[in-house]
Amino acid sequence: MSINTTVSQPAASSALKRLIIRHPLVAYFVIAFAGTWAFLLPFALSRNVNGLGILPFSIPDIALIIAFVLATPAGPALASLAVTAITSGKAGVGLLLRRCVQWRVGIGWYLIAIFGLLLVPLLGYSVFLGVNLPLALLAHSSLLLTVFLPQGVFIILTASFAEELGWRGFALPRLQQRYGPILGTVILGTLHGLWHLPAFFTFILGPFSFPGYAGFLISAIALTFLFTWIFNHTKGSVLLATLTHACSNGAQNVLVLLIPAQLVVSGWAAPIVNGSWQGVNVISFGVCALLLILFTRGRLGYQPERNVQLIEVPRPAGAPLTVEVEHSGRS
């Protein structure tokens, strides 16, 4: 009995590794969701503000803030590092981490990463409100130093770097390789949006409503097209993805201070926009995504040869090519 026990543990571990190697994307998303939701679900199910009240207790708000700060990086970062280590070893982890400091890209891409996700919704709000919000921002340029910059730095330190290590660092190259840039982007945006779901049952992103969450999810998908476009033009730089992510969060906080709390517009957009700033985001980022698809002919800057280099570890010259063969058990 003891012999079977000691043998079965390594066998189970080996079987799990083979499963992860065979399905790295599925493994990544399962671990990413589990690593984050394990922190957030107790709050979402509790009697806290916006919680579902299924659990018969409430948890101090400070605990939620700490859990949120820990949960945001825990899932995607640990998932990307764990799956990469299993599928590609130390060399693969090293390749992934080197892309986190890939800074040699054109200055224009830095400007797009920093200001792009601020200008797109600003232009959208300008159209719907009939106000030149870019000029309004210039008139209140101090917001860039007092809100935009501090928020961006805070998000980099607490969330965006760890998140992007997983979403763009690990998942996006593999999704593009398997499904192409458009479908791969839609899948990533959808799963990224769903990953946030428990936070909508807390005071951080709640209260939950189907229209509000649907707007968030559609915006997340549309926004992911801009991320993919930047990613593909910056040699898969996780650093630029991190910067884009952080500045998008900072941009939303600036917009809150520049636009009315309740939006009222007329015309075709009224059912989407009225009473919800999220509706403007849906339209603004949706139009941006469609334009990117149109002008890049659906490629979003995707280059298969370069994308492969983001996934496969270079083989040393003269090293034998090893291929793992899956045996069916038939002789």
For the regions a protein language model found, what residue spans apply to each?
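Membrane-interface helix/loop boundary segments of multi-pass membrane proteins
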Residues: 162-189, 203, 232-237
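Juxtamembrane helix-entry segments on the extracytoplasmic side of multipass membrane proteins
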Residues: 136-153, 204-218
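Membrane-helix interface linkers and caps
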Residues: 8-21, 43-112, 126-141, 230-236, ...
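Aromatic-anchored segments of alpha-helical transmembrane domains
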Residues: 33-41, 118-126, 189-199, 246-255
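Interfacial helix-loop-helix junctions of multi-pass membrane proteins
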Residues: 199-210, 258-265
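N-terminal membrane topogenic signal
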Residues: 16-29, 277-280
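Alpha-helical transmembrane segments
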Residues: 25-36, 73, 111-121, 189, ...
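C-terminal membrane module of polytopic membrane proteins
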Residues: 48, 236-239, 243-331
